[in-house]
Regions:
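Conserved, short, structured surface segments that act as functional micro-motifs
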Residues: 111-115, 136-206
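Short amphipathic beta-strand/extended segments with alternating polar/hydrophobic composition
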Residues: 51-52, 58, 62-64, 123-126, ...
């Protein structure tokens, strides 16, 4: 009886130890955030707000055949609405890779920073050419530019367009998974709609900021749905 009770206690102890170990291990499908936000100030109506999130947004679906065609039809970055001139900071340590690289869009000015973890961050729609040179090291939180307006008015739609790409610049990744921020709170307010386009043949796919596809630039459209919702008014 005593030996049986001791064996039972040992089994329970082993089970609890294993359970504790499993609970303290990070989930394999949940990558650790590697970067910070591109602003030093906290969000607010006088500083910045989340605009359009990354992914299969309703807005990107509507322009999938023109604005977003090169990115397989989805919004391949995150838009942060902010007044023109708002300082933009580097989201991580790195080295300046490109300045005003027109082949990557996001005019009137842009900046690309290569990070030691293999990612490249792109800062688009900057107000002026960044005062940086290729090869210059930058630190996380260092000012690297100022928010501009792609329409050159500063009253139309001033915002920062931020992308996270691979070193070859051929793939874009979901920044919501890589930037340490309270995205749940940031999604509550802002100037753009929060909806993601729904494929009624697979209605649960790509319906949150956490579940969005990587982009392969130049690849085929991935959201040209047969039965979309909201309906495609252009058809």
């Amino acid at each position: 009886m005593g030996r049986s009770s001791l064996a039972s206690r040992r089994l329970i102890a082993l089970f609890l130890s294993a359970l504790t170990l499993l609970m303290t291990q990070p989930a394999a499908s949940a990558p650790t955030a590697r970067f910070g936000l591109p602003f030093a100030d906290p969000p607010g109506p006088d500083t910045w707000l989340l605009g359009q999130p990354y992914g299969n947004t309703v807005g990107a679906f509507a322009r999938r055949r023109d604005w977003y065609r090169a990115g397989q039809g989805v919004h391949f970055g995150v838009d942060f609405s902010a007044p023109c001139g708002t300082p933009v900071v580097a989201i991580g340590d790195g080295v300046v890779l490109k300045v005003d690289a027109r082949e990557h869009g996001s005019g009137p000015h842009n900046l690309l920073i290569a990070h030691p973890n293999g990612y490249v961050s792109l800062y688009g729609h900057l107000m002026e050419r960044p005062l940086l040179v290729v090869g210059q090291p930058v630190r996380r939180g260092e000012m690297v530019g100022r928010v501009g307006d792609p329409d050159l008015t500063c009253t139309s739609r001033p915002h920062l367009h931020l992308e996270i790409r691979d070193r070859g610049l051929r793939r874009a990744f979901n920044p919501h998974l890589l930037i340490d921020a309270d995205w749940e709170a940031l999604m509550l307010v802002g100037p753009f709609g929060r909806g993601f386009q729904r494929d009624l043949d697979n209605p649960r796919r790509w319906q949150s900021v956490w579940d969005q596809p990587d982009v392969r630039f130049g690849g085929p459209l991935i959201n040209d749905f047969r039965d979309p919702w909201p309906r495609d008014w252009r058809r």
